[in-house]
Each structure stands twice: as structure tokens, then as C-alpha cells.
Amino acid sequence: MTIQNNDRLVYEAMPTRPLVTWPEGRTVAVWHAPNVEHYDYIAPGGGTPQGRTRYPDPQHYMHRDNGNRTAFWRMLRAVDRFEIPSTVSLSLSVLEEMPEVRDAMAERGWEIMSHGISNLRPLYDMPYDDEDRFYELSQQLAETYYGGRRIKGMLGPKVSGTDNTSDLMVKHGMTYHADWIHDEQPRPLRTEGDGRLVSIPYSFMLNDVPLLLAKHYPGSYFVDMAKAQIDRMLRDADEDGQGRVACIATHPFVSGQPYMQRYLEEIFAYLRSDDRIWVATAADITDHYLENSYDEQLAHANGISAAREARA
């Protein structure tokens, strides 16, 4: 039986891979991804994204706008208290339109990861030249409004992309892509030429929107899931020696609500309670992987691919 497989990845079972390790003997890398999003008041191109059915739609728009007006600042206090380095999944229009949010992130040295211009402008079906200009604009916005820094990675707007996305990301200087949630380690993504791009595990499970907004679980459930997930990863890493990655994905308009502060702080306190946990940015995790594991893992993946092709 033949199915259409993704040509960016090679299937490799965890037990057969070369080891991935983290600095100072730590075994689980955890990155916090606050999604600081901006939405068009009237969605471009029509459609019914984010559950919105008619325009204008103050209910859904204002709920999300609350995140940047008030809830962001409450979340910031929790992050500051526990000194959690953060990788902001950012609607890049925030850099220009919300200078207070931008400056607060810059003062703390937060990494910004592209999450598009608006979270109502996905990349699906975008022509090559238009997507190329999208990355050019993304880097221009970061360089202009965020201290000359360039963006190293992306979580696509609405977690969207095209067949050209990986190659264009490399063309514009990016090294990691968070859309690929297929693993518990960074993995090499095949691209044109000799560009190096890796997937880094984001999370749709340890994520406040599906858990708290969509499913209406209590905040305590988010805490319990985060602890259980990372506890199990720590145990697995102790048993097989493989370093792992977990992501805590938050949104100010959800986790920045007053009732959530105690739960967010409980998660952050847990991350600081175990020396085996490396709390880092997505770029730090990617850079370490590229320097220490990428070449060996890519060679191993290519060997598996060649052997399978020879058997075919």
C-alpha cells in the first residue's frame, strides 16, 4: 500500500535515534510561548474564522483585544516573578500598533517568533511571491520596531502554511518552525539547498485556548496536565537518555484573566523547582540542537531514508 508522505521529514522511532542532550546535564527543555495576537476587526477575505459568523463581531474581537489591553500586564507579572524567558508567538502588527506591549517585551529581552501579521490572515494557498513578501515584511517589522533583531522562527498565523513555507523561511534567515508538533525533540526539516531548518515542539495539548476556552476545563486542570506531562518526560529521559522538549502555550486573553493568575504562577513555580528542567527560549533550544545534534541526526535520518528507498 502506498500513501502520500511528507517529504520534509523522515520517520525515525525515538529508541533508534542518536541521543539529544541539553546543557548542564538537564534532560527536559521547556519553553513558554505566550501568543500575543492581533485580529482584524473586519476579517479580510470574508469567511468565518475563530467562530465569528458576522461582521463586525464585538464579542469575539473584544475578548481577544482584552488580552493586549489588560490581561497581558497581569501575565507579565507572573513571568517576571519567576524569571521565565519567553518566546512570543507574535502577530507582528502589534510591534507598530501597540508600542507599550512591544516595549515591555523588549525590556525583558523576550524573543519574538512570527505568528503572522494578523491572526485572521493565514498563509493557506498563498502564491509563492506573496509568501516571499510576507517573510520580507516580517523581518522588516522586527528590525524596525524591535531593536534591529531578526526573527528566527515562526508559528504560522492560525498554524497555516504552504508547500513553499519551509524553503522560504530558510531564505529569510529562520531556523525553526513550530507548526510541526509531531515529536518531543527538535527534528531536521528537509529544505532546498543546504539550508538548516528544524521543527521545534509546540503544543496543542498544554495550551490554554483548547483546554480552558474551548473545553472549559478549570485552571487547576491546566496545572495538573503541565506537571504530569513534564514529570513523565523527566522520567522517560532518565530511562533512555533522550533529552525532550515541552512547550507551555498561553494567550493573555485566557491565562491573563484574574482567576488564572494563581494557576499560571503554580506552573512557573513548578518549572523552577527541578534542576533537570532547562527553561529556555525556542531559539536557545534550536541553537543548541543545531550545534550539538543536528548533523548527526540528519545523517541518521538520511541513512534511514536511503535504506527504505533501496528496499522499495
Residue ranges and their predicted role:
Residues 2-198, 223-248, 254-312:
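Catalytic alpha-helical scaffold of carbohydrate-active enzymes acting on polysaccharides/glycoconjugates
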Residues 201-234:
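A conserved mid-domain beta-alpha-beta active-site/ligand-binding segment of alpha/beta enzyme cores
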